[in-house]
Amino acid sequence: SLDTIPVPVPLNFTPADSNWYFLQTAEEGKAVHYWLTDSLIWKQDTLQVEVSYLKSDSMNILRPQTDTVQFTVRRRPVEKKKKKKDDEPEPTKFLSVNTHAPSSMDVFDYITMTFEEPVARFDSAAIHLRQKVDTIWTDVPFEFEHDSLDVRRYNLYYDWEPGGEYEFAVDSTAFHGIYGLFTDKIKQAFKVRQIEEYGNVFLNITGADSIAFVELLDNQDKVLRRRPVIDGRAEFYYLNPGKYGARLVNDTNGNGVWDAGDYEKGIQPEMVYYYPHIIEFKANWDATQDWNVTAVP
């Protein structure tokens, strides 16, 4: 991942203010995107910027680095449009959005809206969530937030009722992108899964530090869930039936993630322990396991 986020300094153009771009990290922190907001800037054929950042050298020590970068726009040739009848209107090009609201919603899941470009403004009154009560669709309150990591994404949170039926709807023109496009109307219905479809995992842990967390893993070691160890116990609810691995991290600095330490400062990497068995359970089961992390398998 990037050690620091490069800050671009204009060389051959002068922005009207400091808010001339949106910043978006991508590829799990390995890349960064800059979305230009000023048309006087992004309409130029060539942009030159100076970027300063910290870069790890061959000894893995961070050193200041400054580069000059030039971006050249390659214009696509204008396509010839087919002749249309005088009374035939041009089709409207809408702001594209990928909405995550699956027809079978997990009880712990939430709705996401990921736009093709950052949003300049939106009308919160044009966003609706309705629940089917008996036979009547009833509006319910919800939380709608800008994602903290992806500048193009917004999240809708609600405490779903297991087995409940819902409808997510957005009026047309509710969202306007930074390049002038607006969204079409959206309507998606879905049903929340029942509690009986899930299982739970409870780990009774000994031998760990006072601050630690446990991660549940799939068969590729991908992290599926992360929970803190509280009073010697890590609890995972609403899991899909199947097989899981687990690992514990002694969270020395309490920041909720594994840290590699600092060689120059003599700080050791945080200790990691892997559970020596596969955790397997069926639907509507509770799997309770005792785990002494320092015990020899």
Residue spans for each PLM region:
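N-terminal targeting or signal-anchor segments and their processing/structural boundaries
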Residues: 1-297
